[in-house]
Amino acid sequence: MTTSINSVVTVFQNVFTNHGSTLLNGILIATTVGGQSLVRKLTFSCPCAYPLNIYHSLVFMFGPTAALLLIGITVNSTTWKLAHGFFFRVRDTRHSWKTTCVSWIEVLIQSSVAPIAWLFVVFLDGGYYRCYRSHEFCLISDAILCKNSTILNSYASTSSFNKISDNGKYCPPCICVPNPTDASYLEAESQIYAWGLLLFSGVAAFLVITCNRMCDKYTLVQRQYVETYKNVETQKFDAVAKEHASQLAEHNARAFFGQKDWTKRDWDWVSGIPEVNNPLFARLRLIAAEKTQQTMYTPLQLWNDNKGYRIPQPDLQLTQIIVDETKED
């Protein structure tokens, strides 16, 4: 039984390792489609007013598009690898303009999946686009609803009639309930745009991926090995970092609690919050290198340094690394 469970887990791990981005995009698209349907049913209602119908439709069409794009950029790890510490990188480690531009393009492309899915579903639905253009088919002289004097007078008697009809040019009730023939025409046009967007996005994605892989200096098998190495390296780095941080934190904590008693000053030291503008806990300064060879990250470390305690470095069982001493720092 245990063997079967392990086999299933292994299969899922392999699937996510090899096709993780594809599965993630699929889940993202499905979530976007479901979210659009929910928004359409619960919140969207075309207003019987011009030009409010235009603004209302555009907000629902492109507002979530911009939000999804921004969220995609925010959650992309490459964004923060490029941005984090940008102004304080050592000159030799700064990314070249070529690398920066290519990386940002990749981030934008990866973040465009959900926005494009949203636009596709929005145009395929047709309701938003119909509302956006319905006033074009609702001239007050032609609209059937406004030929009914009772309906027209009920709108004309309101103080906002001139605002919602562009001074009597459009028929307000027709904007939110257009003629069925006109509504069908607008919905069909919207769906054409939807499939055109999908076709264009698919072709563009295929061409970009193809060109990128054709220009890759690695073969497919070698690229798979490189990606495997990157993943394993990240896992190992995190594991060793946790071990190192755990030992260092334990040494600092034992130094603090190894005292017989503590003054209020001691507790004030370890209760601080690192702030950029605070000279005591300045992140940018990181306790200048001339004071200590060990970078300080937390108030507890600062307290130990202020006390003059020498905290031993973590003793990690690492494979011996041969350093080329002919290279200058």
UniProtKB/Swiss-Prot annotation:
Gene Ontology CC entries for this record: monoatomic ion channel complex; non-motile cilium; plasma membrane
InterPro entries: CALHM
Topology, Cytoplasmic side: 1-14, 75-103, 213-329
Superkingdom of the organism of origin: Eukaryota
GO molecular function, one term: voltage-gated calcium channel activity
Tissue expression from the record: Expressed in head and body wall muscles, IL2, ASG, ASI, ASJ, PHA and PHB sensory neurons, and spermatheca.
GO BP field: ATP export; calcium ion transmembrane transport; regulation of locomotion
PANTHER family, sorted: CALCIUM HOMEOSTASIS MODULATOR PROTEIN
Listed name of the protein: Calcium homeostasis modulator protein
Gene behind the chain: clhm-1
